[in-house]
Structures are given as C-alpha cells and as structure tokens.
C-alpha cells in the first residue's frame, strides 16, 4: 500500500511563491530584446521643429511703417470663410518677408445678392424660387512700400493664388513735380512705341478717302442689296 505523505502547509506556500517569482523573472520584455539599448537621460529634450514650421502655428509677423503713406490696397473676395482667411494669412507672411509693412486683414461689409426666378417650366412656371449669394471681403493695406516691391508682391500672389479667392488691387505711386515735362522730352523712338499702344484704344481709325468710299459703293453686292442699276457716285 502507498502511504500519503503529509507535508507542512508553510513549506508548500513558500514553494509556490518561489515558483511564481521565478516565472515572472524569466518572462522576456520588449526592452530586453534590444542589446546594449541606451537608457534615455532626463536632461535630454526632444528635437524641436524648425522656426518656419513653428511660425505656421503663430500669427504672421508684421513690420512697422515709418511714414504711414498708403502704397497699395489689396481686396480679397470669396464665398467661403476658410479659403479667404488662409490666403489673407499667406499674403501677410509674403509681405513680411519682402519687407513691406502690411496692415490687416480688415473685414469689409459683405455683399448679399438675391435672385427670384421661375422654379421650372410647364406646370411649375407659376411657382418661384429664391437664390442668395454672400460675398465675403478682406482688406490688406501696404504702407511705405516701394512700387517695384509692391508689384513683385502682387505677382507672387497671382502666381500662388488660392482657388475660390479673387483679388483686386489699387496702387499709388508718388513722383516728383514736372513728370509731364519728362514725358514730353522722350525720344522719338519711345514716342512711337507709346503711340502704337494708344492706337488700339478707342475709334481712332479713319473711314477712308472718297475714292475708297466710291469703291465700296460700286461693289456688286452693295448694288444688288440696294436695288441700284446705275452705280452711285460721290460727285455733287
């Protein structure tokens, strides 16, 4: 017959705790898999982002004007607020890096337009439908700006124009007295270039001489349209 061995309770409990401690110590941890892993020190800090990236989360920087003379008024228009605010922020940052003192954006009164049109044809022609469109505006003013720098700023904004945003700019250039006399003293070659451009504005082309008018009247199509048998003349 087999005898049952009676073990003391204290010895059994101490053995179980020792096995539990041994099992926990033998478990592998993720940090133990990397050999010679350097321990991070408390003094080390995470690398910071570049200044240009940090500046995106801050308000755009602005330069102070010395005299406060307006050089350009840029008006931005859009039907949505988000693209308008985004492009206004972009325009202010571009003006700062070009050395232009910019002020704004100043909210302007919104433009509200409404239309009433027939809803549909046939049986719905007596019912009407209303449409409404709201235009949001912002104003950015450049003061004490060089005209060439202002034109460069506007060209940069046109190149990188955001969709859904319209622009309207008014510029002022200040020159010395007697600028008209300088224009009169231009060389003949430059005057010819200016006259060539002005010739495309308005009705400056002459009708023609009397011989040209008589030639037009003697055309066959003109006589058939007027029902003339004898060609007309310009003689009195």
UniProtKB/Swiss-Prot annotation:
Q: Which UniProt keywords apply?
A: Mitochondrion, Ribonucleoprotein, Ribosomal protein, Transit peptide
The region called Disordered is annotated at 29-49
Q: Which Pfam families match?
A: Ribosomal_S10 (PF00338)
GO BP annotations listed = translation
Q: Where in the cell is it found?
A: Mitochondrion
Q: Does the keyword Transcription regulation apply?
A: no
GO terms assigned for molecular function? structural constituent of ribosome
Listed under GO cellular component are: mitochondrion; ribonucleoprotein complex; ribosome
Q: Transit peptide boundaries, per UniProt? A: 1-24
Composition bias, Basic and acidic residues: 39-49
Q: Which InterPro entries match?
A: Ribosomal_uS10, Ribosomal_uS10_dom, Ribosomal_uS10_dom_sf
Protein task: Involved in mitochondrial genome encoded proteins translation. Involved in the binding of tRNA to the ribosomes.
| Similarity comment | Belongs to the universal ribosomal protein uS10 family.
The record's subunit annotation is: Part of the mitochondrial small ribosomal subunit.
Please state what the protein is called: Small ribosomal subunit protein uS10m
Q: Which organism is it from?
A: Gibberella zeae (strain ATCC MYA-4620 / CBS 123657 / FGSC 9075 / NRRL 31084 / PH-1)
Which lineage do the record's taxonomy fields give for this organism? Answer: Eukaryota, Fungi, Dikarya, Ascomycota, Pezizomycotina
């Amino acid at each position: 017959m087999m005898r049952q061995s009676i073990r003391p309770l204290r010895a059994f409990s101490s053995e179980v705790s020792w096995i539990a401690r041994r099992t926990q110590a033998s478990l592998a941890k993720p940090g133990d898999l990397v050999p010679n892993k350097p321990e991070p020190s408390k003094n080390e800090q995470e690398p910071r982002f570049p200044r240009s990236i940090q500046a995106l989360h801050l308000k755009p920087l602005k330069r102070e004007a010395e005299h406060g003379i307006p050089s350009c008024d840029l008006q931005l228009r859009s039907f949505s607020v988000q693209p308008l605010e985004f492009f206004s922020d972009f325009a202010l940052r571009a003006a700062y890096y070009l050395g232009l003192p910019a002020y704004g954006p100043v909210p302007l009164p919104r433009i509200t337009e409404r239309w009433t049109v027939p809803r549909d044809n046939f049986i719905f022609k007596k019912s009407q439908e209303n449409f409404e469109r709201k235009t949001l505006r912002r104003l950015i003013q450049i003061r004490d700006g060089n005209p060439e720098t202002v034109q460069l700023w506007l060209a940069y904004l046109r190149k990188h124009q955001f969709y859904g945003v319209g622009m309207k700019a008014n510029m002022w250039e200040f020159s010395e007295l007697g600028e008209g006399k300088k224009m009169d003293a231009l060389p003949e070659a430059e005057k010819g270039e200016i006259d060539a451009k002005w010739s495309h504005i308005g009705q400056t082309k002459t009708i023609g001489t009397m011989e040209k008018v008589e030639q037009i009247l003697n055309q066959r199509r003109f006589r058939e349209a007027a029902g003339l048998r004898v060609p007309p003349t310009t003689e009195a």
